Amino acid sequence: MRRLISVVALCALALTTQVLPVTAQALDDPIPRPINKGGPQVRLEPVAIGLTAPNWGISAPGDSNRLFITDQDGILWKIDLASGAKTVFLDVSARLVPLGAFGPGTFDERGLLGLAFHPDYANNGLLYTFTSEPVSGPADFSTMPPGTPANAQSVIAEWQVPNPRTAASVVDPSTRRELLRIDKPQFNHNAGALNFGPDGLLYISLGDGGNADDEGVGHSPQGNAQDPSNVLGDILRIDPAGTNSTNGNYGIPADNPFVGEAGFVPEIWATGFRNPFRFSFDSATGKLWAGDVGQNDIEEVDVVTEGGNFGWRVKEGSFLFDPNGDDPGFVTERSPGEPDGLIDPVAEYDHDEGISVIGGFVYRGDAIPQLRGRYVFGDFARSFEEFGRLFHFRSSGAGQIQEFRLVGQDSLGLKLDGFGQDANGELYVLGNTTGTPFGDTGVVMRIAPRERDNNLEADLNGFAEVDAATGQFGAGDLNGDGLSEIRLRPENERVCFSLRWADIDEPVASHIHSGVVGVNGPIVVDLLSNADNFRHENGEGRANGCAEDVDPELIDDIGNHPGAFYVNIHTSPFPGGAIRGNLERSEVGI
């Protein structure tokens, strides 16, 4: 069913919102009801620090141990979820426009904005990026008048990773292949999300081109978002492996909703958006959820459907919108379901609650059962002077938006830049304290249950020991093995432990060290000297006890990044360590 209304109807709708009767007034408080805190209480666990402005995070198909994070300044990070260690996977910073829309160090919406892995990435190593680049040659799509340069160009590119199943592999920059290039009239409203849908095709979100009210140079008379002859203000659907596009670099699926219709760009899958900066597919239902950033009044969440028109700039959210000539536009009245042919959001809020919606994910993880099936999203900031907010509502119906209750935090304490989702469906909060693509305050935080699972364990063996001189594995007692179980007690500054071992000489020491797999590190907690019970007989034994007066910050660090710490047992024949293993979370406590 063709849901996009005709160009004639769109023009008529635009006229009705520009020439309003004198009784039409701007609404001072479109949605009086506030967003209150409610629902499951959660903790935010730091995973990685020292980024700039992280805005999107996903796992690569077949890789459950890492999260790949786009940083607005041009770095694509590969982050180890156990240790928090980060590696540069791809650096496109040299390709970007100079960031800082109002000068160095200032706010900007351009940069490295999107990432998607090909569904068969584990075999073909293909991935795709969305970047804001300087004008370089003719664009595949442009709304700019002849002789008028664009502010920047939005570029979708394909890259390849050799040996993608190898953990140390990174992107080969020489494999870059450009799919399409789009002129951007202004610096803002880029959108920037990339996702492969359940159908195996690539979906791309584009904003209306920038400026206020979808007006100005590079904007159609009715606004780009209601002009089906250009791609701005739309979500596109393409086949990266195809060749039937005008430039021959990608394919246009034959079942796209507007293929063959005169005056319509055939790449369009849905239209009528202002700035759908983030969208995602629900892994359980396949539905596409998008957060569309509003103008001066309304932020909205949409369930996007094929061929749908989501209203901008005829409407802002479920409210009629008046572009108001040369003055700032405003909403006039709520008009659910009208005009005919426009689709209203499933959730919305006004600017008393936030200024820029950040779309997220429907939670399908296991760690927080009470959150399952809820759409998790947020807002960049309550105001430009305040921090961001985290929201959720039930995805199965007309759920009321609630703000997360955070353990130990009255507020998020960050500008919210985006969300991440790992291979297990667990979600991550991405943000920084500056609200700009500069500095190193960017963080990645896991949304975790209210009560942290403080039970950890490590399987111990001699092969895991690393030679201090050569860095080679196998420096321990290759006949021995063991198990260490750890219970973190931050409330009373204790680390309790149980050690078991077999086929080694009598232990002389045991510790928790700082260090990921394959790396030797310093002692942080002495275990064996704090043992209440110790037994060793015929090469086997056990010990248990609690280390007292341990720094609570260290306990938190171990709990947040168990993979960055290891337990080992020392013997006289192996003073550097007989058996060793890195910590991981355990479902069994001691």
Residue locations for each model-derived region?
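Conserved blade-ending motifs and adjacent loop-strand segments that build the rim/top face
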Residues: 273, 399-423
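Metal-centered catalytic cores of metalloenzymes
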Residues: 451-510, 514-590
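C-terminal segment of classical bacterial N-terminal signal peptides
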Residues: 14-23
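Beta-propeller fold detector
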Residues: 45-46, 85-94, 167-180, 246-257, ...
